[in-house]
Amino acid sequence: VANVSSTNPQDTNRIVSLQCDMEVSKLRASMGDSIKLYSARAKAQAALGPQEVDVTKPAIDFSLRADSLFFSAAGTRMAMNVAGIKMKADKLNDSLWMPKGIVGFNRLRFRTPEFGLPIRMSKTAVTVDGPKITLKNASVRIGRSNMTATGDMMGVYRAMTKGEKLTAHLSLTSDLIDCNQLINSLSFPEDTTEVLTDSVPSEMKLFVIPRNIDFELQTDLKKVIFEKMLFENVHGAVDIKNQAIHLEDLSMRALDADMKAVMVYKAGSPRGVYAGFDFKIRYINIAKLVDFVPALDTIVPMLRSFKGRVMFDVAADARLDSAMNIRIPTLRSAIHIKGDSLVLMDGETFAEISKMLMFKNKKENVFDSISVNVTVHDGNVTVYPFLVEIDRYKAAVGGEQGLDMNFNYHISILKSPLPFKAGVNISGNLDKMKFRIGKAKYKDAVTPAAVHRVDSTRMNMGNEIVNRFRRVVLGRQPR
């Protein structure tokens, strides 16, 4: 049913006023082969008339209420339940109209070919102002993840119909973000079963960031699941642009420790990934730390011999293969570990050293403090000499190892009950170690000046890694 009325102005330059009231049970429309629109049980009003500022240019007022509304374009589909639209559009030139108004709905479901999970929104209203859409406390659900979004989005229509850039500036709050499921939805965009089966992927796979995404997000997240880790109270900025994800100055809590993090992930194609992170973790249990960063077992295997809490700073970057494995020759890292009252647990290595140096027979030996600098470059790990005090001894420990687990460490005895200064050389690998008594090599390596130089070396390397992050986020190749 439709009612149409019009006016015939005396001024021939003035746009004719035309009004149409329409009520339909079903409405189908299409534009070309890709854009389709369907509506059920709809009431609509449309009015064409002159613009207020220029009567020679047309303006359209449009309102619609529909039990359901469906729209599809270029493989992207959007469906709304109990939809309401109130819009006004002024014509700017021959092909450009500028819409303003409100779109509301009880429920919305959105699907795109690049993402394996539907995006669902509950009852909300969004404001439209030209290409800008404004959200206010919009409730969004993606699989097991939920969030509330406030902010602006630009270019939604052109992103859906032409694949052009989609820009967003949003504040997000959430009770739960399941990164495993979201990553799966990017890794397997056409396989919903694969995405929904398990929150913990049995094997992490490379996922490519869509080229047309440019998001700046401020986050306040209660819980975030990533692999087998649970992060709580996550706050900070997340930028997604230039096919990269940049987590900037995030604060969080996990493994009973406070953390701050900067992270970058860039995947422009399925062939490989650049990834990097800069973590500062305060007073974390060593056993949990090794579980959190499993690569530490390879880089600093001696760490598992200690018990206690440490401050842990690490900056690292590397290229990953399509299965998200580190390409070892590309790994660069700068690590600092500091702890007080750490317990060295008894083991074969310590037992051999104790026998050689005549330590008192103890199952546990306490270090007053340690401060260790480690760097990784070109497949080699360097543990810079650091000072330890245990039992009646003061010693400097350092050395090198390959990521193939072959190592060459040295312990210089600087103070002991023995009448001479000596050193212990430890070489080989964890399965077959050789111990030799020799000269103390690190007599001058743990002076304040030497330690300061080492600190500077490690910090400079860490800064270089973080600077590479910034180049990647700006769309440049890391050097």
Segments (PLM) and residue ranges:
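Membrane-proximal interfacial segments on either side of biological membranes
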Residues: V1-S122, V128-P131, R141, S145-L250, ...
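Short catalytic-loop micro-motif centered on adjacent basic/acidic residues
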Residues: L135, L247, V383
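Extended serine/threonine-enriched, polar tracts that run as long, contiguous segments within proteins
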Residues: V376-D404
